[in-house]
Amino acid sequence: MPSKTKYNLVDDGHDLRIPLHNEDAFQHGICFEAKYVGSLDVPRPNSRVEIVAAMRRIRYEFKAKNIKKKKVSIMVSVDGVKVILKKKKKLLLLQKKEWTWDESKMLVMQDPIYRIFYVSHDSQDLKIFSYIARDGASNIFRCNVFKSKKKSQAMRIVRTVGQAFEVCHKLSLQHTQQNADGQEDGESERNSNSSGDPGRQLTGAERASTATAEETDIDAVEVPLPGNDVLEFSRGVTDLDAVGKEGGSHTGSKVSHPQEPMLTASPRMLLPSSSSKPPGLGTETPLSTHHQMQLLQQLLQQQQQQTQVAVAQVHLLKDQLAAEAAARLEAQARVHQLLLQNKDMLQHISLLVKQVQELELKLSGQNAMGSQDSLLEITFRSGALPVLCDPTTPKPEDLHSPPLGAGLADFAHPAGSPLGRRDCLVKLECFRFLPPEDTPPPAQGEALLGGLELIKFRESGIASEYESNTDESEERDSWSQEELPRLLNVLQRQELGDGLDDEIAV
């Protein structure tokens, strides 16, 4: 017998084209063991990325809150997906552990098949799987996350839920066909009995059976086309609300990577039950009309969202306009303040210009005598102009100023006087100005000053312009005895020096 090699080994468990379970098994239910991570309300997802992000967010939030996983049993049947809490109880009489079930107290959640929106597992962690179900009362999507022990177990659970969709779809087709056959038989009977028993209606039992069939029907009632009883098993991760018609019976879904088994949902799964439908729609409403209503509702939601966006933009523009207006007012206030400051500065500058012009006029009207006297005043200041003498000149502390008296004219030059030395580098000459003829002779104390027209000097050495030479009497009275030694060394010297290189006349 030929032995199996690695080339002819076939594992039907991973073949997506082969169903995992028998269809009759879904009537009783297929049970799986897993750990329940948690559930959260999520907005309607539009892509797989949003679903995976919601799945991971639930995991991280429950892990951050330190909420432990609960061991549960997942029951998949035609009635829906039922999650039951599994709990251990010790039986003291039997002295062993047994698993006991109490569905009334341990039921975690139960969702019918047509309300399950999406089912898949995480691509990064294949042990994690989840399904999104829609609540019938509040129409809110809720994501339930689970974790299995093995990756293959999670894949089997996902494929089982997908196969449950297909089984329910087949059952809905059978119910629809039976209802159509019953209606045809009833019409034929009414036509045959129209002559003998016209106006015959259904009895109460028939009405109750028909209503029960309509309530237990998972999908909307639609007459299927003949020759479409066989379903193609294509399991892929797809949006169960995305519907594409193929012959009017089922939809073909996109097949993705084998590592992420995908599920195909019939468009009938999307339709709510007869109790949750709008009052305007009956059980015999065509599927296209329902889709048109869904499209109109989505368009209305889109228009509302666009209106909200436009209103938000208007508010934003108003806020920007108010901010710009406030900034403009602030800028105007600053400009006004700067204009006031500039005005004050211009006034101050104009005053300074006037003062400068007045000073220029005063300086231009000053006579030459005032400038000579100013130079004399600067010369006699201590330290203003150093006198360069030979090394034999004695120090200033060795000099003794003679007292002022009547014999000042006959004062002999001391040895340390710079005016009394002929070989000094700098010599000061005294110029005598003759007074007018009709002027009375000066007093004896004023013999040294002679015809010099002295004016009062400022500290800067510049003669004040506004003081005239005619106020000689006031100027002479202002001189005190302390100011006379300043011209003590000015002598009556008439002759010139021997050379111009060693004498300077001021």
UniProtKB/Swiss-Prot annotation:
Q: SMART domains in the record, alphabetically? A: PTB
Q: Which UniProt keywords apply?
A: Cell junction, Cell projection, Coiled coil, Disease variant, Phosphoprotein
MF (Gene Ontology): nitric-oxide synthase binding; nitric-oxide synthase regulator activity; signaling adaptor activity
**Positions in coiled-coil regions:** 322-363
Q: Which GO terms describe its biological process?
A: nitric oxide biosynthetic process; positive regulation of membrane repolarization during ventricular cardiac muscle cell action potential; positive regulation of potassium ion transmembrane transport; postsynaptic actin cytoskeleton organization; regulation of calcium ion transmembrane transport via high voltage-gated calcium channel; regulation of cardiac muscle cell action potential; regulation of heart rate by chemical signal; regulation of nitric oxide biosynthetic process
Q: Signal peptide position in this chain?
A: none
Q: Which domain of life is it from?
A: Eukaryota
Chain positions with Phosphoserine modification: S188, S192, S195, S266, S371, S374, S401, S417
Identify the tissues in which this protein is expressed: Expressed in kidney glomeruli podocytes.
Annotated stretches, region: Disordered: 175-224, 241-260
| One CC-aspect GO term | cytosol
Q: Where is this motif: PDZ-binding?
A: 504-506
**Annotated spans, Interaction with NOS1:** 494-506
InterPro entries cross-referenced by the UniProt entry = Adapter_Engulfment-Domain, PH-like_dom_sf, PTB/PI_dom
Q: How does it assemble?
A: Interacts with the PDZ domain of NOS1 or the second PDZ domain of DLG4 through its C-terminus. Interacts with RASD1 and SYN1, SYN2 and SYN3 via its PID domain. Forms a ternary complex with NOS1 and RASD1. Forms a ternary complex with NOS1 and SYN1.
Q: Function, please? A: Adapter protein involved in neuronal nitric-oxide (NO) synthesis regulation via its association with nNOS/NOS1. The complex formed with NOS1 and synapsins is necessary for specific NO and synapsin functions at a presynaptic level. Mediates an indirect interaction between NOS1 and RASD1 leading to enhance the ability of NOS1 to activate RASD1. Competes with DLG4 for interaction with NOS1, possibly affecting NOS1 activity by regulating the interaction between NOS1 and DLG4. In kidney podocytes, plays a role in podosomes and filopodia formation through CDC42 activation.
Alphabetized PANTHER family for the sequence: CARBOXYL-TERMINAL PDZ LIGAND OF NEURONAL NITRIC OXIDE SYNTHASE PROTEIN (PTHR11232:SF76), PHOSPHOTYROSINE INTERACTION DOMAIN-CONTAINING FAMILY MEMBER (PTHR11232)
Disorder noted: Nephrotic syndrome 22: A form of nephrotic syndrome, a renal disease clinically characterized by severe proteinuria, resulting in complications such as hypoalbuminemia, hyperlipidemia and edema. Kidney biopsies show non-specific histologic changes such as focal segmental glomerulosclerosis and diffuse mesangial proliferation. Some affected individuals have an inherited steroid-resistant form that progresses to end-stage renal failure. NPHS22 is an autosomal recessive, steroid-resistant form characterized by onset of progressive kidney dysfunction in infancy.
Protein's name according to its UniProt entry: Carboxyl-terminal PDZ ligand of neuronal nitric oxide synthase protein
